[in-house]
Amino acid sequence: MSLLEITGLTHSFGENLLYKNAGFTLNKGEHIGIVGQNGTGKSTLIKICTEQIIPDSGRVIRQPNITIGYLDQYAEIDHTLTMKEFLKSAFAKLFEIEIQVMQLYEKAADGDMKNLELAAYYQEQLETHDFYSIDTAIERVANGLGLLAIGLDRPIIEMSGGQRAKVILAKLLLEKPDVLLLDEPTNFLDKNHVAWLAEYLSSLENAF
């Protein structure tokens, strides 16, 4: 099934023609890479896919309701957070469901079966999405990218630019979007971390 498709893409940057009637299709679970010299339009293509740039002509077709994750290493981060707090925000929707579950169980304390059944349904959703293994998932990714040694309780404001870029990458990996768009993800990674990332991505079921 096609998750993302570009057809008839033509786009220029100033007088430099980057794409002429180009296209590609990204299917479910498919892993593709785009290589080229600096200035050939790799980053531009990703921004076209994420609708940050409108192409001169062509169509970008996305499956409805899919999630697309884009690696922006220079995104603004809330500096009041610790690394762990920021990484936990990758699971914000699950934490919202947890609050709903607790509220429903409170309402069901008087024997309301409707609220009890609803709470059980949401509880199952949490278990399906490995909610109770979040800390383990965070430690695995943080360790793979060399962040665990820094300390998960380290405030973001105390981290270097390279460390923050790795934290942004870690959060994106934890979010597990349907489509993962990575623009030079090995920036700031040493050899061991690059090897870990390659192995992690090769085992990923989602498309990137």
Regions found by a protein language model. Name each.
Residues 1-208:
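ABC ATP-binding cassette signature C-motif
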